[in-house]
Curated annotation (Swiss-Prot):
Organism name: Penicillium rubens (strain ATCC 28089 / DSM 1075 / NRRL 1951 / Wisconsin 54-1255) (Penicillium chrysogenum)
Chief localization: nucleus
One protein family per Pfam: XPG_N
CC cofactor: Mg(2+)
Residue positions binding Mg(2+) 2: D179, D181, D233
Subunit structure: Interacts with PCNA. Three molecules of fen1 bind to one PCNA trimer with each molecule binding to one PCNA monomer. PCNA stimulates the nuclease activity without altering cleavage specificity.
Gene behind this protein: fen1
Name of the protein in its database record: Flap endonuclease 1
GO process terms (BP): base-excision repair; DNA replication, removal of RNA primer
Length: 395
């Protein structure tokens, strides 16, 4: 799930933190990718007529199809991917995971019912909700990556946290995940949509943590408190606290402790904090996650030549893939992983920091833009209200 509405909060209040561009803009970069999130997206997206792809023996192959071709797309564009797999989830996450299992069980039941009575759209909708990444999916993807010569490592717990460690140490340029909580783990740069298919034509989002903090006028501790208040994987959300409310509460009170004190003493009793709401534990998981240091032997990785015959045996022999396409993919891997050794020009130059005047100018422009948006919103609401108040048939 990640952090609810965090992208919206950053895009509206710190737009300078987000860059969008094409995948080719990341040529020559090493990127640590949240493997479990990627596999989940492959299981949902790589489909035929609403169903996951299957081998002749009835085994799911959507995860392998996605992993093979989306990784090829990255390598074709000069990116050197490193996949990071989740370890055991933190105990605090067990409540959220239990809810997900329950939701999937409900969706499975609804899916079966939709098959009998529903439309094709209903079947597709409930089918996607039943998707779960299993140990077998992970094991098969690891086998595929090994045969492709693409490195992977196993995180002690959360993959995003381990990706962030590697990015902070400079072993990779960025962490790649759809989960916005990667920023809570202090990844300097987060890439989103990197493993999407080319057909979706979604630009790659590049989010810079330092610019987000600057635009929000927060330190990291306040940012983590904001993310917990917005809603994370570790805690139930507080009812009636949306993006705007969460941001204004942290801005005004500066910390979760002060926010909770305000809620408790509020005479209107607008907010009801769940009885068991261990926000301090959630904060600790973001601040000091269970990760390996970047110089740990298990964080060493390198890219190898693909094992072509091994790929043929696994993908073609065992899983029924097309042999010509697999051989073509292996040839592309061999060619482009060598090409990606070229350095990016930016590696030779130190980026110039913005001056205080430039920062002030950017903030002023952003504030003006926000005021214009608010003004337009008010005008639109007023026009809508007036239109409703007009008698029918009035000119």
């Amino acid at each position: 799930m990640g952090i609810k509405h965090l992208y919206q909060v950053i895009s509206e209040n710190a737009p300078d933190a987000i860059k969008t561009g094409e995948i080719k803009n990341h040529f020559g970069r090493k990127v640590a990718i949240d493997a479990s999130m990627s596999i989940y997206s492959f299981l949902i997206a790589v489909r035929s007529e609403g169903q996951q792809l299957m081998s002749e023996s009835g085994e799911t192959t959507s995860h392998l199809m996605g992993m093979f071709y989306r990784t090829l797309r990255m390598v074709d564009n000069g990116i050197k991917p490193l996949y990071v797999f989740d370890g055991a989830p933190p105990k605090l996450k067990s409540g959220e995971l239990a809810k997900r299992v329950a939701r999937k069980a409900e969706a499975t039941e609804a899916h079966e019912e939709a098959k009998e009575t529903g439309t094709a759209e209903d079947i597709e909708k409930f089918s996607r909700r039943t998707v779960r990444v299993t140990r077998e999916h992970n094991a098969e993807c690891k086998k595929l990556l090994e045969l492709m010569g693409i490195p992977f490592i196993n995180a002690p717990t959360e993959a995003e946290a381990q990706c962030a460690v590697l990015a902070r140490a400079g072993k990779v340029y960025a962490a790649a995940s759809e989960d916005m909580d990667t920023l809570c783990f202090e990844s300097p740069i987060l890439l989103r949509h990197l493993t999407f298919s080319e057909q979706r034509k979604e630009p790659i989002q590049e989010i810079h943590l330092d610019r987000a903090l600057e635009g929000l006028d927060m330190d990291r501790a306040q940012f983590i408190d904001l993310c917990i208040l917005l809603g994370c994987d570790y805690l139930e959300p507080i009812p009636k606290v949306g993006a705007t409310t969460a941001l204004s509460l942290i801005k005004e009170h500066k910390s979760l402790e002060k926010v909770l004190e305000f809620m408790k003493n509020d005479p209107k009793k607008k907010f009801v904090v769940p009885e068991d709401w261990p926000y301090e534990d959630a904060r600790e998981l973001f601040t000091n996650p269970d990760v390996r240091p970047a110089d740990h032997p298990e964080c060493d990785f390198k890219w190898e030549a693909p094992n072509v015959e091994g790929l043929i045996e696994f993908l073609v022999g065992d899983k029924g893939f097309n042999e010509d396409r697999v051989r073509n993919g292996a040839a592309r891997l061999s060619k482009h992983l060598k090409t990606a050794q070229q350095s990016r020009l930016e590696g030779f130059f130190k980026p110039v920091a913005r001056t205080e005047d430039e920062k002030a100018s950017l903030k002023r422009k952003h504030d003006e833009k926000l005021q214009q948006q608010k003004k337009k919103k008010k005008e639109d609401a007023k026009a809508k209200k007036e239109a409703k108040a007009k008698p029918r048939g009035a000119a």
